[in-house]
Amino acid sequence: MSKTHFGFESVEENEKAKKVAGVFHSVASNYDLMNDLMSAGMHRAWKAFTIAQANVRPGFKVLDIAAGTGDLTKSFAKAAGPTGEVWHTDINESMLRVGRDRLLDKGIVTPSLLCDAEKIPFPDNYFDVVTVAFGLRNMTHKDAALAEMRRVTKPGGRVMVLEFSKVWDPLKKAYDLYSFKVLPWLGDKFAKDAESYRYLAESIRMHPDQDTLKTMMEQAGLDAVKYYNLSGGVVALHLGTKY
C-alpha cells in the first residue's frame, strides 16, 4: 500500500484517514473557540474575503466542502436565498453534526451531507461555486479531490480553495515559533488536546505552497487559476474557473 504523510509522520494511506478523523472528532466541540484563539480572530477576515470573491447570487448552487461549523455555508445560504441550493458537507461526522446544529441555531435550513471530497456524490456540471476552506491539506489525494471539485462545477463556475500556505520569509522564524510552541500550548490549555494542534502545525508545513497548489489546480483542469496571499502568506485563497 502507498505511503502518505500525517503531519511529519509517514503512514499508510488508509491509516491517514483514520488519524485525521480522530483529530477532528477530538476538536469538533471546541473548533470555533480555538479558531478565534489561534488566529486572533483573523479567520473571520479570511472567510469574509472568500465570501466576497465567491459573489454568490440568488439562485446559485453552492457546494461547501469540509464545511465544518458552517461559517461559509451560512453566508452562502443567505446570499443564494430560497431559490438557491447550498450544501454543507464534511467527511467527519462530529464536525458535520456541530456545523448542522450551529446553522439551525442561526435559523439557516440547508442540507448537510457526510461527503468524501475525493468521491463527490453529485452529477457533472451541477454547482456554480465549489469551496473548501482549511480542508484540502487534510485530504490524502488532493489531486483527486480537485478533479472532483472541477467535475461537479458548471462551465463558467469556480472552484475556491482557502488554505494555510507558505508565509513570507521575514515572518518565517516568528511563525515557526508560534506554530510549534504556542499552538500546542493553546490546544493543551483550552481544549486539553496538544497533539491535535501539533498535527495542525505539521500539516500546514506539509501542504503545497502557493505556486504548487496553483499548478495542481491547473493540472486538475481548471483555468485562469490565481491566488491571493492573506496576512503575509499565512493563508492563501486560490480561485480557478471551469471553462
Curated annotation (Swiss-Prot):
It comes from Burkholderia cenocepacia (strain HI2424). It is an enzyme of class 2 (transferase). Keywords: Menaquinone biosynthesis, Methyltransferase, S-adenosyl-L-methionine, Transferase, Ubiquinone biosynthesis. SUPFAM superfamilies: S-adenosyl-L-methionine-dependent methyltransferases. It catalyses: a 2-demethylmenaquinol + S-adenosyl-L-methionine = a menaquinol + S-adenosyl-L-homocysteine + H(+); a 2-methoxy-6-(all-trans-polyprenyl)benzene-1,4-diol + S-adenosyl-L-methionine = a 5-methoxy-2-methyl-3-(all-trans-polyprenyl)benzene-1,4-diol + S-adenosyl-L-homocysteine + H(+). The gene is ubiE. It comes from the Bacteria. Belongs to the class I-like SAM-binding methyltransferase superfamily. MenG/UbiE family. The keyword Lyase does not apply. PANTHER family: 2-METHOXY-6-POLYPRENYL-1,4-BENZOQUINOL METHYLASE, MITOCHONDRIAL, METHYLTRANSFERASE. S-adenosyl-L-methionine binds at residues 69, 90, 116-117. Methyltransferase required for the conversion of demethylmenaquinol (DMKH2) to menaquinol (MKH2) and the conversion of 2-polyprenyl-6-methoxy-1,4-benzoquinol (DDMQH2) to 2-polyprenyl-3-methyl-6-methoxy-1,4-benzoquinol (DMQH2). The lineage of its organism: Bacteria, Pseudomonadati, Pseudomonadota, Betaproteobacteria, Burkholderiales. Disulfide bonds: none annotated. Pathway: Quinol/quinone metabolism; menaquinone biosynthesis; menaquinol from 1,4-dihydroxy-2-naphthoate: step 2/2; Cofactor biosynthesis; ubiquinone biosynthesis. One of its GO terms (molecular function) is 2-methoxy-6-polyprenyl-1,4-benzoquinol methyltransferase activity. This is Ubiquinone/menaquinone biosynthesis C-methyltransferase UbiE.
